[in-house]
Design a protein with these regions (language model features):
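N-terminal cationic and glycine-rich segments that engage phosphates or anionic surfaces
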Residues: 1-102, 109-236
């Protein structure tokens, strides 16, 4: 007799595979968040890059979005912020520039072209942001080489690794879109935020202390974080 798999089993398998694939991508993301970038003094890095010193700053926000990778200067240190910025820029340009507006109205083919443009802009922004981050590390005396040919070579490698990390994260998000449960970028952002949950609780506690002590800074910072978070979710 021919044996057939019951429909409910087939349906269950079809539903569970995307979930397992998404979890696998999240594991890869967390592994990349601990891979150290070369040519950095890890001992100096731990003493200088202290997230507790970044409270109420944009650095704290970036560290949260990267799942703590920013403070450790790892492969995914820049997180997915270059892609988010690129998406925002392209969406605004689609309204302001007629050729891009027409492209956005061309259906699936137009969306693929806009997605390709967004990727290129992401790499460009990644290089810019990686360069800025490198100089931050250089000024913090975290880099191993600070003069001569070694300085230039290590600078290029570090910047390219940071940029490559952003490109890999963008690719991981697209894999979740294609083979996982969808919303890949949002899921990676969520995974990073969950990894930083203890730090977030600590930051919220500091905000609360500011409010209890009568500081008006609390009433500015909390809405700012909410607006930034909602903007990211809406764009992605």
């Amino acid at each position: 007799d021919n044996t057939t798999i019951p429909d409910f089993v087939t349906e269950w398998i079809n539903n569970i595979i995307p979930i397992l694939f998404t979890l696998l991508i999240i594991v890869v993301f967390r592994i990349g968040s601990v891979i150290q970038v070369p040519f950095l003094d890890t001992a100096a890095l731990r003493s200088v890059m202290n997230p507790d010193d970044w409270s109420n700053t944009m650095l704290s926000y970036m560290n949260t979005l990267s799942g703590g990778a920013f403070s450790n200067a790892t492969l995914f240190a820049m997180g997915i912020t270059p892609y988010i910025n690129s998406s925002i820029i392209i969406q605004l340009l689609c309204v302001a520039i007629p050729p891009l507006e027409r492209l956005a109205r061309e259906g699936e083919a137009g969306r693929r072209k806009i997605s390709a443009i967004t990727r290129y802009v992401t790499v460009g922004l990644g290089i810019i942001q990686g360069t800025a981050y490198y100089f931050y590390l250089l000024n913090s005396k975290v880099t191993l080489y600070n003069s001569g040919f070694e300085l230039w070579f290590s600078a290029i490698v570090i910047i390219l690794v940071f940029t490559a990390g952003t490109a890999v994260m963008m690719w991981l998000g697209e894999q979740i879109n294609s083979h996982g449960i969808g919303n890949g970028i949002s899921i990676l952002l969520f995974a990073g935020i969950v990894a930083q949950f203890p730090q977030i609780i600590n930051t919220l506690g500091q905000y609360w202390n500011l409010a209890v002590n009568g500081s008006t800074q609390f009433f500015f910072l909390v809405p700012l974080w909410v607006v930034l978070f909602v903007a990211v979710v809406w764009i992605i």
